[in-house]
Amino acid sequence: MKIIADTANGMVGPVLQKLFDRIPQLELVPMYFEPDGTLPNHGGDPLQAENRVEIEERVPKESADLGIMFDPDGDRFFCIDKKGRFIPGDFMTAIMSYYFLEKHPKATIVYDIRASKAVADTVIKYGGTPLYNKVGHSFIKKRMEDTGAVFAGEISGHYYFKDFYGCDS
């Protein structure tokens, strides 16, 4: 599997390289892995379309299976499909919910109130309990703690994991 990853000259590049070095089945094509706080290649917000232009063009051109784009501090990410299309945070939340529900049947999944119906529909379809919530780290983490949710996602690209004590990663 070939993956192009853009870390926006943030801190994720060196860490991601070490991770991919341990998974020889994955071919990593790095973009902007050298940390540089001036962000010389493009802005750091993956939600801004102008910051995604290059990776959206490169993924299909280089026959990659997937593109991954991180913000500079590494607490948000989004994917680009093999045709170069951006996958919004709520759809990423729905996709990851499927994974968590396979591992934790009937689990609770928290998502932000701005998300489309795709999240709730996916969670229900695969036997989980969807709970929408106020936007923001503190609100999401509290709701996860109160309900025992295994996973949460926001359209901003923040994803939270019970295994990491509700922290976003």
Task: Show where each model-derived region lies.
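Phosphate-binding chemistry for phosphorylated carbohydrates and sugar-nucleotides
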Residues: M1-S169
